[in-house]
């Protein structure tokens, strides 16, 4: 198995352009109605998060689904429907530059208010932070923080995810100075930062959707929406408990 930091870096460094809308099949209804697989807030003993977070504590059968970007309004809508129907708990890392988050705020905000969905900071427009000046890094984080507060009434602190997983000690410190002291990486992936087939997304999910993993996905290409039934089946058959980062970690 690929080491945690290597897995994050391998996917992160594939390409640098900001995610953009793709010409690919539109999201469609899943083959059968999605069924609820989880209800309520998991009762967990919370731990302090590390400053560099890759996975979850080895307690229980928890898994964290973390979904980035939001290029496609249709995919964001499909994810929200998946969350509402199944009861899964998800942490989104939005880029506020994408209109999808404003468009779907009426649906998303109640899920945020209930705690079923958490929001983290993924910067305003998805640049490689390592290449930016100090002031530009701060602007990317603060602008997105302001957007999340004004739109959803919550702060994303202390969790931020650097675009492409590209970070260094300088970026980490600048983020921490803004209250973002947990650089949130991952140790599992759907691999869908690129356009994959449904079979490829599902194969990645089968490999990485396991206990104690922080799994990264993207609300960009619609491919993942065609395997929502299979993802729900995996969670159910493996007796996984989906969690937000706030469910697991005490940051107060």
Label each residue range with its predicted role:
Residues 63-66, 90-94, 118-121, 158-162, ...:
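Structural recognition of the beta-strand scaffold that forms the well-ordered cores
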Residues 74-75, 101-102, 127-131, 167-171, ...:
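Extracytoplasmic/secreted cell-surface and envelope-processing proteins
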Residues 166-208, 240-251:
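His/Asp/Glu-enriched short active-site or ligand-binding loop at hydrolase and phosphoryl-transfer sites
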Residues 29-128, 136, 140, 147, ...:
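Active-site beta->alpha N-cap acidic-glycine motif
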Residues 84-91, 118, 134-168, 202-217, ...:
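CE4/NodB-like, metal-dependent polysaccharide N-deacetylase domain
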Residues 48, 52-58, 100, 223-252:
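C-terminal domain-boundary segment and adjacent tail
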Residues 78-82, 106-108, 170-174, 227-231:
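A short acidic, amphipathic alpha-helical/loop segment
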Residues 1-17, 22:
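N-terminal twin-arginine translocation
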């Amino acid at each position: 198995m690929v080491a945690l930091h290597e897995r994050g870096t391998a996917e992160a460094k594939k390409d640098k352009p900001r995610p953009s809308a793709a010409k690919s099949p539109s999201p469609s209804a899943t083959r059968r109605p999605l069924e609820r697989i989880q209800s309520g807030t998991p009762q967990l003993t919370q731990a302090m998060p590390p400053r560099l977070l890759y996975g979850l504590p080895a307690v229980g059968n928890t898994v964290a689904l973390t979904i980035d970007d939001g290029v496609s309004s249709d995919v964001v809508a499909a994810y929200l429907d998946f969350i509402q129907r199944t009861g899964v708990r998800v942490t989104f890392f939005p880029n506020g530059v994408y209109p999808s988050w404003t468009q779907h705020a009426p649906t998303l905000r109640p899920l945020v208010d209930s705690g079923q969905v958490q929001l983290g900071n993924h910067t305003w427009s998805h640049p490689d932070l390592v290449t930016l000046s100090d002031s530009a890094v701060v602007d990317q984080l603060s602008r997105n923080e302001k957007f999340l507060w004004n739109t959803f009434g919550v702060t994303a602190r202390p969790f931020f995810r650097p675009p492409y997983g590209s970070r260094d000690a300088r970026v980490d410190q600048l983020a921490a100075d803004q209250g973002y002291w947990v650089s949130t990486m991952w140790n599992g992936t759907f691999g869908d930062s690129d356009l994959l087939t449904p079979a490829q997304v599902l194969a990645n999910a089968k490999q990485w959707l396991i206990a104690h993993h922080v799994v990264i996905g993207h609300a960009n290409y619609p491919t993942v929406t065609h395997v929502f039934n299979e993802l729900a089946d995996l969670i159910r058959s493996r007796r996984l408990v989906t969690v937000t980062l706030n469910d697991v970690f005490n940051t107060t």
